[in-house]
């Protein structure tokens, strides 16, 4: 079972020492557990994923319009960035180069530095780069996604205000889209809930707040990650409510919705679910 609103950002989390969102899927032996989940007789499992939803929301929220347009046109953003890295056209056949592009797009949007990027490339993609190359990748990402960098800075200012709200300051929108409102209480989300940072204060190494796990360090890039995850969770949650009008979702795995359907109605169910998940939310109608 999943725990509703188990994470700080509102995402579901595991419970009873099991997290169905993180079942192994690559290792042949370990993925046997995932493969053991079967539908009833004469039924099928339908898994529909909102592709790259957090990466899409990030550039949309930042107002990085050129990158938003790539998603809107259905372009491969991993290949696009890899083409910039290698100064030549990269496509899906160039698996190693595309993997570098993918790791950068998914890993550098929240302020990751060159040391961590170097480790992630080796761990997730089996690609080793030296320190100079890792620094170049980080620099290139930030040049291409300059509005994302500005969003980190904007969130740093939001932390400062939330920690000590100026007497003459009115609530204000964070990022583009007018879906996030910075208030003394925290950051108000489109569904009316808040991302909060209890007892937020400026420490010797930056801002920090209290949580059930202890004292947590926080900065603009991490705030961006928080709000992007929260917005993605709202998108999926609203889609599940609409899907539930005709078909019952049985599981959500981060950005995916899982339903069970009879074999006879599988295509109709799939078309219905995909239609809903291809529709932008009312509070972000221009989200690709």
Listing of model-derived features with the role each one plays in the protein:
Residues 58, 116-129, 141-146, 257-274:
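Catalytic palm subdomain of template-directed nucleic-acid polymerases
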Residues 81, 85, 100-116:
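Core structural elements
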Residues 86-98, 125-138, 285:
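Short, surface-exposed acidic
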Residues 94-104, 247-248:
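Alpha-helical scaffolds flanking conserved acidic
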Residues 133-164, 264-288:
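Polymerase palm active-site segment centered on the conserved acidic dipeptide of motif C
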């Amino acid at each position: 079972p999943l725990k509703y609103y188990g994470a700080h950002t509102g995402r579901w989390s595991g419970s009873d020492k099991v997290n169905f969102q993180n079942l192994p899927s690559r290792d042949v032996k370990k993925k046997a557990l995932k493969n053991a989940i079967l539908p009833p007789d004469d039924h099928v499992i339908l898994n529909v994923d909102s592709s790259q939803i957090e990466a899409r929301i990030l550039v949309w929220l930042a107002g990085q319009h050129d990158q938003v347009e790539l998603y809107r046109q259905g372009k491969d953003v991993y290949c696009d960035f890899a083409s910039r890295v290698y100064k030549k056209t990269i496509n899906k056949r160039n698996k190693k180069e595309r993997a570098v592009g993918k790791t950068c797009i998914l890993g550098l949007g929240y302020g990751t530095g060159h040391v961590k990027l170097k480790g992630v490339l080796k761990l997730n993609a089996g690609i080793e780069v030296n320190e100079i190359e890792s620094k170049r990748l980080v620099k290139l990402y930030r040049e291409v996604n300059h509005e994302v960098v500005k969003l980190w800075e904007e969130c740093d200012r939001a932390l400062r205000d939330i920690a000590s709200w100026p007497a003459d300051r009115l609530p204000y929108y964070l990022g583009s889209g007018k879906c996030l409102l910075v208030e003394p209480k925290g950051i108000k989300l489109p569904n009316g809930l808040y991302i909060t940072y209890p007892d937020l204060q400026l420490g010797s190494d930056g801002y920090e707040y209290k949580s059930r796990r202890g004292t947590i360090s926080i900065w603009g890039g991490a705030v961006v990650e928080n709000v992007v995850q929260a917005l993605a969770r709202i998108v999926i949650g609203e889609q599940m409510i609409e899907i539930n009008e005709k078909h019952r979702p049985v599981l959500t795995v981060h950005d995916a919705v899982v339903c069970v359907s009879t074999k006879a109605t599988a295509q109709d169910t799939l078309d219905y679910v995909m239609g809903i998940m291809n529709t932008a939310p009312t509070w972000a109608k221009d989200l690709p």
